[in-house]
Structure formats: C-alpha cells, structure tokens
C-alpha cells in the first residue's frame, strides 16, 4: 500500500480507534511510524523516517498523559523541524530542543490543546501542514491555517484532506485557507490503502518500451486516486500507453508507437516519477524536458 496514505491513516487510527486499515505499506518508514505510535518508553527513535518525525511531533504534543524524547539518526538530527515546533508552540504545545535549536532531538510534554488559528508560509513541507491538520480535528476549537504565498506539494495536502473527509471529518481548503472542524469521534469503518502510483511508474515504462499490443494488469489501483502520481495515466498517453480503469484494477496497453519526439512536462506536483519518465524517454529516443 501507499506509504503516504498508510502514515496518515496510522495517525488517524491512533486518534480514532474505531478506524481499521487494510493493505498498509510494508515500508521501513511506515514501520517506524507504527512503532513510534505504540512504544511505551520515554525515548522514541524514528531513525531516518522523516514523516514519522513530523507526524509524531504533532501527535505527542497533544497527548496529555505522555512525556517523550523524540529523536532519530544523525542525519535526522540535521533535518530542520523548527517551523512545525513553532506552530505547535503557538497553539500551546510544550516542546524543547535538546541539542541544536530548530532540530531534533525534541523533549515533548503532552498538553491539552484548544486549537484555533495559525498563519504559516504556504511553501513549507506539506508534511508540516498535514501533521497539524491530522491532529487538528481533535482540538475543541478545531484548526484553521492561513497559508501565506503559493502552496507547494498540493497533492499531498489534498490527500490529507480527502482522508479526513473519508472518515467523516469536515476539512475544507478554500484558496489559501484550510479549516478542520472538531470531530470527537468517527463511525467504525475499514479503509483499504491504495498501492503507490509511483511504483506503477516502472510498469508504465515497461509497457511504453514494449511492442504495440503489449498489455498488463495492476491490481487495486483507483481512478479516483488521492495520489498526485496518478497523473501517470495521462502522461504515458504521450508514449502510446492507454490506461483502462476496471473496478479494482487497471490495464495498461501499448496502443501505438507514433508519438512526438519531444516531451515537456512540469512535475512540481509529482516529482517522484521524474526519473522513470526520463528513462522512458531515453529508451524511446524522445527528447525530454522536465521541470518542477
């Protein structure tokens, strides 16, 4: 399953235990996220898992019965987290730096957070914003984020909001304003995590480089996907690959080999598929211009 969806749903399940999750990602990052949510000791080490560091910072900041030290690998301790910490502090969180200001490790004393409004730059990591939004639904006053500037990584923000909505939590994005409303509980339900579309890119490339008429099926992919990399289905039409969406799977077919010898695309919303597209273009002899 998708690592991005899995990490968000694991945090939501911790907040709303009636939620059940199937097809969770087997990735190391997701395993670290799961361990970090369930460890009972005072120190939690997430290794190199950046998403876990950010999501767990927000989660433990509002766990009133816990005091933890959140740390990671040497590399993780060089990755900034100050923007998220400052945002949580403005909401009333108690978080201290144990070494370098603005970087892990963190000492977090969980507190009751009422919620309210925050102003934050729109071009920060979408994981900072998602961390705040995921826990914001439990705040008595909810959470409203005023985003300054142009929003980057919009697909990941939309994924977070869509998952909240799927659980029955009202979360709305209007221009540069995001509001998540207080939701004390959600109905019992099971969510099946969709596979990573970035992983599907290798199969798209394989079909694009195959003979006309070549075909394969990939299970559990959805037409109405939450993932930005779903744009693969549109992009690979440029390389003669047609995508047919069935009820619980997709079919890739190499329909033609009469395509343009020049391909240009802005991958700002889907950077993870850039390398695969570049390799596809090289194999087909297509001149490639990718930006983002």
Describe each PLM feature range.
Residues 1-292:
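Short, structured segments at the rim of ligand-binding sites
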